Amino acid sequence: VDGRGNDLEPLNDSDLFKKGATSLRMSEIGYQSKAQKNLNIKYNDLDEFLDEVKSAITTPYPEFENLGLKDSEGEFHQISSGILQIENELYDCIRPKRAGSSGERPYDLLKKEGIKYLEVRGIDLDPEDLAGISKDKILLLDLIMLYCAIKPSSLMSDKEKSIIESNDIAAIN
């Protein structure tokens, strides 16, 4: 967090914390990218999702372009100058996934074979549970995910996406 504004408090000589914060990892000081701030990736349809991800990978981000791909010694210091360097850099609270062989791109796997599972990224460990999450909480999460998968719902609008993002920020911070 050096050089970035934050409202964390010192815990000791080397650590910071925020009382009541639920997930620093998913907050604005965690796995976030200002380059992704204006992406409008929704989960209405796999093809639409993949088109948006591909666009984010192939659309240059000025700050990344200015860095260049290699440093002064010719060593790579970034993969590309795209808004997303690779698919796995999409920092969202949930991501469709499919495991594949080493070297296969997540985009290609999802396009060719579809979704195998969802990566739910907004869940942190429960410090009160030795395993990090209880069996009951996993089962509840399973039920919620199954319900969402089988219940028909309307497509996510731009306004709804914006509200979800605002709610995420409010809940995390």
List the predicted regions and their residue ranges.
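Substrate-recognition/cap regions that form aromatic- and gly/pro-loop-enriched pockets
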Residues: 111-113, 118-173
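Loop-rich catalytic cores of soluble enzymes, especially ATP-dependent carboxylate-amine ligases
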Residues: 1-109
